[in-house]
Swiss-Prot record:
SMART domains: Bet_v_1 (SM01037). InterPro entries: Bet_v_I/MLP (IPR000916), MLP-like_ligand-binding (IPR051761), START-like_dom_sf (IPR023393). One of its GO terms (biological process) is defense response. It holds the Pfam family Bet_v_1. Belongs to the MLP family. SUPFAM superfamilies: Bet v1-like. This is MLP-like protein 34. PANTHER family: MLP-LIKE PROTEIN 423.
Length: 316
C-alpha cells in the first residue's frame, strides 16, 4: 500500500513592493535605524529596541513590539545576514508570538533600485516551518510587511521634503588667536563671551547640564539689528579634536521667524602660519517665504569673532 506523504510544514512566501524612496534609504531604516521604523509606521510597529550588539551587525539581537491581526505582539530577532552592497538584511525570529506557531521563521528584506528610473523594489522573503499543519501560512504577515513598506516610503519622502526646505549660510573669519582658545570660549566658557564683545552679547547662562557638554542648555542675551534679544540653545555636538561645537536654538526671538535654527562653529589652525580660521555654519528653516535669510546674524557672528580674537590676544 502506497504511503501518503505528510504535507510539508516548511514554507516560503514572498512579495514585492514598489517604492519611490532609494534602495539605500529603505535598507538603512532596517539596518541602521530600525528604532525609527515606529515613527514611520506607528499603527503597525510601536518600538524596536537593541538587546545585544550594534544596530545592523550580524549576531545582534533586536526586540520588536508590533500589532498584527489586531493583536499586540512581540518578536525577538537575531540579525543573520547584512549585505550593504545588495541592500539586504535577514532576521531570524528566536522568541515571541511567532514561535507559538512556527519552529523557525526567517525574514529577508532586499531592496533593489528600479532600472531606468527613480525608486526601488522591496523584496520580502519569509521562510518558515510550521509546528503543525493546522497553522496557517503567514499571508497576513506578508500583507503587514507591504503596509509597513508603504508607510516607510511615505516617511522617507516626507523627510526628503523637509531637507529641501532647510537652507544654509556660512562664512569664514580669519583670526590671530589659536583654534583651541577660540573654541574654548564657546565650549568651555561662553559666559566669558560677553566680556569680549559686550556690545553684542550681554550674558550667557547655563540652564541645564555642564558647559560644553552635549544636551546642556544655555541661555543668551544679545543685541542684534539694534534690538535686545534672547536665545535658549541646546548643545547638539562637541568635537574638541576638530574644535567644533553645534548649538540648536530651541526658544527665543529666532523661533518667531524660523522653524529650526542650528549654528555650528568650527575653528581650524591656519596652514603654515600662526592664527586660525573660524567657520560659521547656519542651517535653518524659515516659517514662510517673507522671512529674510539671516545674513545680518552672520555679520553679527563675524563681529563677535573679531572681538573675541582681540580679547584673547589681550589676555596673552
Amino acid at each position: 500500500m502506497a504511503k501518503t506523504e505528510a504535507p510539508s510544514l516548511v514554507g516560503k512566501l514572498e512579495t514585492e513592493v514598489e517604492i519611490k524612496a532609494s534602495a539605500g534609504q529603505f535598507h538603512h531604516m532596517f539596518a541602521g535605524k530600525p528604532h525609527h521604523v515606529s515613527k514611520a509606521s506607528p499603527g503597525n510597529i510601536q518600538s524596536c529596541d537593541l538587546h545585544e550588539g550594534d544596530w545592523g551587525t550580524v549576531g545582534s539581537i533586536v526586540f520588536w513590539n508590533y500589532v498584527h491581526d489586531g493583536e499586540a505582539k512581540v518578536a525577538k530577532e537575531r540579525i543573520e545576514a547584512v549585505e550593504p552592497e545588495k541592500n539586504l538584511i535577514t532576521f531570524r525570529v528566536i522568541e515571541g508570538d511567532l514561535m507559538k506557531e512556527y519552529k523557525s521563521f526567517l525574514i529577508t528584506i532586499q531592496v533593489t533600485p528600479k532600472h531606468g528610473g527613480p525608486g526601488s523594489i522591496v523584496h520580502w522573503h519569509l521562510e518558515y516551518e510550521k509546528i503543525s499543519d493546522e497553522v496557517a501560512h503567514p499571508e497576513t504577515l506578508l500583507q503587514f510587511c507591504v503596509e509597513v513598506s508603504q508607510e516607510i516610503d511615505e516617511h522617507l519622502l516626507s523627510e526628503e521634503e523637509e531637507v529641501k526646505t532647510t537652507e544654509t549660510l556660512e562664512t569664514e573669519v580669519e583670526i590671530k588667536a589659536s583654534a583651541e582658545k577660540f573654541h574654548h570660549m564657546f565650549a568651555g566658557k561662553p559666559h566669558h563671551v560677553s566680556k569680549a564683545t559686550p556690545g553684542n552679547i550681554q550674558s550667557c547662562d547655563l540652564h541645564e547640564g555642564d558647559w560644553g557638554t552635549v544636551g546642556s542648555i544655555v541661555f543668551w542675551n544679545y543685541v542684534h539689528d539694534g534690538e535686545a534679544k534672547v536665545a535658549k540653545e541646546r548643545i547638539e555636538a562637541v568635537d574638541p579634536e576638530k574644535n567644533l561645537i553645534t548649538f540648536r536654538v530651541i526658544e527665543g526671538d529666532l523661533m518667531k521667524e524660523y522653524k529650526s535654527f542650528v549654528i555650528t562653529i568650527q575653528v581650524t589652525p591656519k596652514h603654515g602660519g600662526s592664527g586660525s580660521v573660524v567657520h560659521w555654519h547656519f542651517e535653518y528653516e524659515k516659517i514662510n517665504e517673507e522671512v529674510a535669510h539671516p545674513e545680518t546674524l552672520l555679520q553679527f557672528a563675524v563681529e563677535v569673532s573679531k572681538e573675541i580674537d582681540e580679547h584673547l590676544l589681550a589676555e596673552e
